[in-house]
């Protein structure tokens, strides 16, 4: 008796839960929709929200750990490597991407769509785009730095400069300033969440909306993504140079030693492989994200699944790249082992900051 009653009440409770947490102004709802459609829709949105939540939370933790580790090296008096300076900026840019895109999209997936006003939406989109472009520029800088370090004949006058921390800091600063200025146009295009008052907005991202004419959207997309495609082309060229140099170097080593010595990869080779993994993954997912972004910008009222997939693809690299760096950096494993050993030998020892 009780079981039959619960079976009858379950669809009604699910529909009440959906209507309670999800706004009825959304374009996804229809007056003639069956209650079972509400169940499937609620399950799909909760599943998307959980995916956003896990990916964003894990990525923020990984990037925060990297930032703390690099700052710890600096504060303890040790000297940072030139690549550490670049990777610290990359971790900061990735954190911005996850914080200003992943968190709002997670809230929108769970039905919290109207927490941001018009000003909040503008700055969330602005900081997200700045973080995305800085991440792209930083990857290009890291790729070019390693290519010149492996093969100085590419640009001989840069060989000495790339060893200077001041020069690396200046290059990292150049990765920020242009994008801080160029992305100011986002403040004019983004509005608050889509509702009955601004139903003429072109694209709805769940928590914010985008409004512009078709002609202006196409022009903005071309001007916005042209530097990105140039940067991706530079990545391909620098990565190809590194692959060619490593292949030629491997052939020379095998010829000189005739395979009598153990071919143990050097530190530069391991670093280059790590950078190649980062660059290749960034290239693939950023290209897919750019295509989806252009699609949602040019096409009127894109499907919500396109918007969700665009956010997932955009967050893939920022959420996984810190763990590639953590696993490839031997200093981190040595640091964790030292902390564990100290805690085992001196369990009552309190380490002062």
UniProtKB/Swiss-Prot annotation:
Keywords: Cell membrane, G-protein coupled receptor, Glycoprotein, Membrane, Pheromone response, Receptor, Transducer, Transmembrane, Transmembrane helix
Protein's recorded name: Vomeronasal type-1 receptor 1
Record's GO cellular component terms: plasma membrane
InterPro entries: GPCR_Rhodpsn_7TM, Vmron_rcpt_1
Function, in words: Putative pheromone receptor.
GO molecular function, one term: pheromone receptor activity
GO process annotations (BP): response to pheromone; sensory perception of chemical stimulus
Domain of life: Eukaryota
Annotated glycan sites: 117, 198
Main location per the UniProt record: membrane
Residues in the Cytoplasmic compartment per record: 78-84, 154-169, 248-274, 325-353
Name of the gene this protein is made from: VN1R1
Subcellular location(s) per record: Cell membrane
Similarity comment: family membership: Belongs to the G-protein coupled receptor 1 family.
Record-linked Pfam families: V1R
TM stretches of this protein: 57-77, 85-105, 133-153, 170-190, 227-247, 275-295, 304-324
